[in-house]
């Protein structure tokens, strides 16, 4: 399959993101994964960390992962990040239809995404599934289902723990935690 794109706020990136991406590499014949931080997600509140800080956290988290890269087209556009618009750019830049890694929850609501009908014509999807949920298959979407490890960690929980002075050891890479503490990110979020 080659390459895939893993979009998200990454506010902050955590071990769950990294392990899911590694599982996709191993289970779905993907050589490279480009983590693609959204400037602003159309479905989430504005990130707390700045685009520059989230990019730096990704760099620190992924620097020892030879299969992991960062694609910053959405950060550079400085607008709400719509997957369809990014897919058009990625298709031209990489000369192939982009493959996006999405969670099963996102797959179930894909029809609510901006220009969904156009998106599914130009992009492929790897749907990461945790556990034994029944699979609903939408035949309009070119998707591969990938059972990944269940890692119950969320960026929201990490931000709250940091805000209240609780440990996030083993939840995020040490270098990312050092950066967060040095920058004072999430201390008063």
UniProtKB/Swiss-Prot annotation:
Pathway: Cofactor biosynthesis; NAD(+) biosynthesis; deamido-NAD(+) from nicotinate D-ribonucleotide: step 1/1. The keyword NAD applies. Keywords: ATP-binding, NAD, Nucleotide-binding, Nucleotidyltransferase, Pyridine nucleotide biosynthesis, Transferase. One of its GO terms (biological process) is NAD biosynthetic process. Its EC number is 2.7.7.18. It catalyses: nicotinate beta-D-ribonucleotide + ATP + H(+) = deamido-NAD(+) + diphosphate. One of its GO terms (molecular function) is ATP binding. Catalyzes the reversible adenylation of nicotinate mononucleotide (NaMN) to nicotinic acid adenine dinucleotide (NaAD). NCBIfam families: cyt_tran_rel (TIGR00125), nicotinate (nicotinamide) nucleotide adenylyltransferase (TIGR00482). Belongs to the NadD family. This is Probable nicotinate-nucleotide adenylyltransferase. The gene is nadD.
